[in-house]
Curated annotation (Swiss-Prot):
Locations listed in the record: Endoplasmic reticulum; Mitochondrion; Cytoplasm, Cytosol
Key word Transcription regulation present: no
UniProt keyword list: Cytoplasm, Endoplasmic reticulum, Guanine-nucleotide releasing factor, Mitochondrion, Repeat
Assembly, per entry: Interacts with Miro.
Domain of life (superkingdom): Eukaryota
GO molecular function, one term: guanyl-nucleotide exchange factor activity
Record-level GO BP terms: muscle cell cellular homeostasis; regulation of mitochondrion organization; rhabdomere development
Main location: endoplasmic reticulum
Gene3D superfamilies per UniProt: Leucine-rich Repeat Variant (1.25.10.10)
Record's protein name: GTPase-GDP dissociation stimulator vimar
CC terms in the record's Gene Ontology section: cytosol; endoplasmic reticulum; mitochondrial outer membrane; mitochondrion; plasma membrane
ARM repeat start-end pairs: 72-118, 346-391, 392-432, 510-550
Length: 635
């Protein structure tokens, strides 16, 4: 329709006193216009306000329909944002359901008011001032609609109107909560859940309101019965849009550990498993794949709760997740791994997984996916699970024998920070108490060079810290048992336990440590670790330096290596780092750290070169200033 024709229609509508039938015809022509922007130059609000008050129902209905079409334009939305127009619409909605049961006029009023409210805070504020929110919410009480032919359309536009209104933000959502919106929505959802297929449209146009409230009301917790209904709707529905809404709502609710347990006990994870097994071959579109991932993520989220994890450990879900380790679908495979990683949060579960060969299946999957081009999310999940499995002492030897280290060392070529972080953490947990393995890894030039590189250059603090810690742990677990007797004071707890048991011998193989030190930057890494942010890392650095000092500085037979170590320690300004450590951390030092600090300083003093270096940085005086030592002296 051309602009001139639009102008003519509007002129006729404004200036001609015509019969209701002719008015209706004019309105029908206007509402049939495809481009609402054609009306932007016209001032139509007052004209249409009069028409909405006409005695003729058809005129009122067509006028409301025209307003709904015209206000699809932003310009006209603003022009129709008038108190008297919105008040008239609200008055009309107060009469719903109408005396004759017809929903045609309420449908058009809902459309018109809904379009006016779209991205229009001024209109929403007017509704609030007129206490129209109570009128809008009362529409949710209409559960039986006599006008069967228009029932579906009313349900749709009611949902659209309320959505456009509630999208106005936190204030409107909270006011709706005060007016009992949740009880009204729960009533509708109960009806929908009673027969999901029959009430699909009702649910599709009601659940978005829950989503809006969830986004705008902080810490909105649904009643447990509502969460269970959402779970049941998910199980019964074949509509992907409805499934997506249920999953998103349950995702938000499942942030609560209490809800995780409720959903676990209601069988939600098994429901999702069965649905994914049923539809996995159909996930060929990006939308279907996104829905599948959302469902997978909900299983994992529920398993992050302690109580829900322990409950699900006793259900068939455990075997289902193990079965997914054989899946060729990357999302199901990754979910299976993530699920098992969450199950592996207790020693007893971890030991069971090793005994049942589940650990071997995880290693098999990792062996096929440990390259630079493989899926990063899967790699991260695998390393997380294996890290948990290797923590219990009874598991360590079995996991090492199964080839964990050989499988993950090729992953040093991967430089994705989350994967590297988990890789280093897994190795660190594996070498805990494993002297033979620690000795082997100290000789692994590729590993040590990469650790030095990451300790200096990573933008990811976690990778920097894990690189330093792994080097310190390798030194500690390879040599602490050999040199504990030589420590001048009791310090690190393991040293105390070992010192009474080992023979006073100095005959041990230093080749692993020598090869470690031959890599440029290793001594610097341990020295730099002294001023790490975390006390535990400072302590680990002190222990590593104590071991280096005992192995080389106190042994005449190691004069050449001792000189190299002394030169390197001076070059790295170990005195300056120790001074920084004392100055920054003395107030928070534990007794254990102080003892290890004293051990370290005393051992360094076995070298005249280092005595002079430490004096330059006033280490002796700084040691006296440590509060915990001052307290001992006072006592």
């Amino acid at each position: 329709m051309a602009t001139a024709e639009i102008d003519d229609l509007i002129e006729k509508l404004k200036t001609t006193s015509v019969s209701p039938a002719n008015t209706t015809n004019l309105l029908c022509e206007i509402s049939a216009t495809k481009d609402p922007k054609l009306f932007d130059k016209h001032e139509l609000a007052e004209c249409f306000l009069g028409l909405t008050k006409c005695d003729d129902t058809n005129v009122r209905k067509e006028a409301a329909k025209c307003i709904a079409e015209i206000t699809k334009s932003e310009v006209q939305r603003k022009k129709f944002t008038k108190r008297n127009i919105i008040a008239a619409f609200l008055e009309c909605l107060r009469q719903v359901p109408t005396s004759d049961g017809s929903m045609e006029l309420p449908i058009q009023i809902c459309r018109a008011l809904g379009n006016i409210c779209y991205l229009n805070d001024e209109a929403r504020d007017l509704i609030l001032e007129l206490e129209g929110d109570a009128v809008l919410l009362r529409l949710l009480d209409i559960t039986t609609i006599e006008d069967v032919a228009n029932a579906a359309q009313f349900i749709k536009v009611r949902g659209g109107l309320l959505s456009n209104y509630l999208l106005g933000g936190e204030g409107l959502a909270k006011r709706a909560m005060e007016l009992g919106v949740m009880k009204k929505l729960q009533g509708i959802i109960d009806i929908g859940a009673s027969n999901v297929e029959q009430h699909e449209d009702l649910l599709l146009n009601t659940l978005p309101l829950l989503s809006i409230l969830t986004e705008n009301v902080s810490d909105l917790n649904f009643d447990s019965s509502l969460n269970i209904q959402l779970s049941r709707i998910l199980a019964a529905s074949t509509n992907p849009d409805l499934a997506e809404m249920c999953l998103e709502l349950l995702h938000y609710q499942a942030e609560s550990d209490e809800v995780k347990l409720i959903l676990a006990k209601d069988g939600l994870c098994e429901t999702i498993y069965n649905l994914l097994e049923k539809y996995k071959t159909l996930a060929s579109t990006s939308e279907a794949r996104a829905l599948m991932k959302l469902a997978c993520e909900l299983i994992v989220l529920i398993l992050t709760g302690d109580d829900s994890m322990h409950y699900l450990y006793t259900t068939p879900l455990l075997k289902n997740m193990v079965d997914w380790l054989d899946s060729t679908d990357i999302d199901l495979l990754t979910t299976g791994v993530l699920a098992l990683g969450n199950f592996a949060r207790t020693d007893s579960h971890c030991i069971y997984f090793v005994e049942q060969q589940t650990m071997n299946k995880l290693l098999e999957v990792l062996a096929k996916n440990n390259g630079v081009k493989d899926d990063v999310r899967l790699q991260h999940a695998l390393l997380s699970a294996l890290r948990n499995l290797v923590i219990p002492k009874p598991n360590k030897n079995a996991v090492i024998q199964a080839g964990l280290v050989q499988t993950i060392l090729p992953m040093l070529e991967i430089h994705q920070p989350p994967v590297v972080f988990k890789l280093l953490g897994t190795l660190r947990m594996t070498v805990d108490g494993q002297e033979k393995l620690a000795l082997e890894l100290l000789k692994n030039k590729t590993l040590i060079e990469q650790l030095v590189h990451w300790s200096k250059s990573s933008d990811y603090a976690g990778v920097t810290g894990e690189s330093l810690r792994l080097m310190a742990w390798l030194i500690k677990h390879a040599y602490l048992s050999k040199i504990a007797y030589a420590l001048p004071r009791k310090g690190d707890a393991p040293a105390e336990q070992i010192a009474d048991k080992i023979p006073l011998t100095q005959d041990y193989d230093r080749s692993s440590l020598s090869e470690f030190l031959a890599n440029e930057g290793t001594v610097e890494a341990m020295v730099s670790m002294l001023t790490a942010q975390h006390l535990v890392m400072q302590n680990e650095a002190l222990i590593a330096l104590c071991i280096l000092s005992v192995v080389y500085l106190s042994q005449p037979s190691e004069a050449a290596q001792a000189q190299l170590l002394q030169d390197e320690l001076v070059k790295c300004e170990v005195g300056k780092k120790l001074a920084e450590l004392i100055s920054k951390s003395s107030d928070t030092m534990t007794k254990e750290i102080v003892e290890n600090l004293q051990n370290c300083v005393n051992l360094l003093k076995s070298s005249e070169q280092l005595v002079a270096h430490l004096e330059q940085h006033n280490i002796n005086e700084l040691l006296k200033s440590i509060p915990i030592l001052t307290e001992y002296c006072t006592l």
